[in-house]
């Protein structure tokens, strides 16, 4: 039987091994931020926690504890113990925690023990583990050389990164493809969950034995997910690799990402009619989001072309007209913006090349 308390020195092992954790915080706390390997089985529901918190402020700790026991009692208490025991049966090596590793953790552990179930709780709870992960992100740029993968929109940076063991996929963690049209069907994680998942990915990367940390050249915001400032500053100072691709391939890749995959995803989720409506709204609203930068005239031109493409798609099952507005968007908006940004980092460019050439360059970098 392991010790009743899991020490802070084991945080790294918990995250690297995706150790199952029973999170006994209230649902509202879990929703704000949690770890990927945790399951929310609360000691108190939101309303119960709120009442106990109010009592604590007005009457002190002992009165709050007494109220908590009266709220979680009888059949309610038994149901929660059974839910915890069921989780532990399915995850025999599970740990538990609350926010600070205090009373809620101790009480849950005690009630389970009385039911014949032994579960260690984590020292410091969620708060201390979260602080540990923040430290991982802040320290990461000093652990390995940082390389930033740049390239024009549609050149396949994400596809390339997914083939490289040196890479951490920031857009995958943020569930957003980074561009104005980068929104996915499922929502992005909360900011806290984005940071938690980034830190765990960095921890896993540091144990992989690779020579560098390869990241896509991102803006501070990936959709609504903000990169931690210290980490972003390090990315801005990193050496740059430029992935190159032909315009024809870029166009086809963007049509596949913006049109084919998104349309299929919406239809699968919502059905054909509602799916097409949601898909159309996704395209048109993505365009609206860059209207100020495009200017009214150019926005209107792109919107008209986009609507023509949508009409042809729904009436003739033909997506070829989408290539027209995508091509215009590239050459009037994305490419000039990219070239301007690249000019500002030209002194840090180590290599430019195709997918194959870039793979070969990185393979040789690994052995230097």
From Swiss-Prot:
Write down the PROSITE patterns for this protein, in alphabetical order.
Answer: RHODANESE_3
Question: What EC identifiers does the entry list?
Answer: 2.9.1.3
Q: Which residues form the active site?
A: 98 (s-selanylcysteine intermediate)
The UniProt entry, under InterPro entries, shows:
Rhodanese-like_dom (IPR001763), Rhodanese-like_dom_sf (IPR036873), SelU (IPR017582)
Substrates-to-products reaction catalysed = 5-methylaminomethyl-2-thiouridine(34) in tRNA + selenophosphate + (2E)-geranyl diphosphate + H2O + H(+) = 5-methylaminomethyl-2-selenouridine(34) in tRNA + (2E)-thiogeraniol + phosphate + diphosphate; 5-methylaminomethyl-2-thiouridine(34) in tRNA + (2E)-geranyl diphosphate = 5-methylaminomethyl-S-(2E)-geranyl-thiouridine(34) in tRNA + diphosphate; 5-methylaminomethyl-S-(2E)-geranyl-thiouridine(34) in tRNA + selenophosphate + H(+) = 5-methylaminomethyl-2-(Se-phospho)selenouridine(34) in tRNA + (2E)-thiogeraniol; 5-methylaminomethyl-2-(Se-phospho)selenouridine(34) in tRNA + H2O = 5-methylaminomethyl-2-selenouridine(34) in tRNA + phosphate
Biological process (GO) annotations? tRNA wobble uridine modification
Regions crossing the membrane: none
The Rhodanese domain, residue ranges: 15-138
4Fe-4S as a keyword? no
**Superkingdom as given in the UniProt entry:** Bacteria
Q: Name one Pfam family in it.
A: Rhodanese
- What keywords would UniProt list here? Selenium, Transferase
Q: GO terms for molecular function, please?
A: transferase activity, transferring alkyl or aryl (other than methyl) groups; tRNA 2-selenouridine synthase activity
Family, according to the entry, reads as follows: Belongs to the SelU family.
Q: What is this protein's function per UniProt? A: Involved in the post-transcriptional modification of the uridine at the wobble position (U34) of tRNA(Lys), tRNA(Glu) and tRNA(Gln). Catalyzes the conversion of 2-thiouridine (S2U-RNA) to 2-selenouridine (Se2U-RNA). Acts in a two-step process involving geranylation of 2-thiouridine (S2U) to S-geranyl-2-thiouridine (geS2U) and subsequent selenation of the latter derivative to 2-selenouridine (Se2U) in the tRNA chain.
Q: How does it assemble?
A: Monomer.
Q: Any idea what this protein is called?
A: tRNA 2-selenouridine synthase
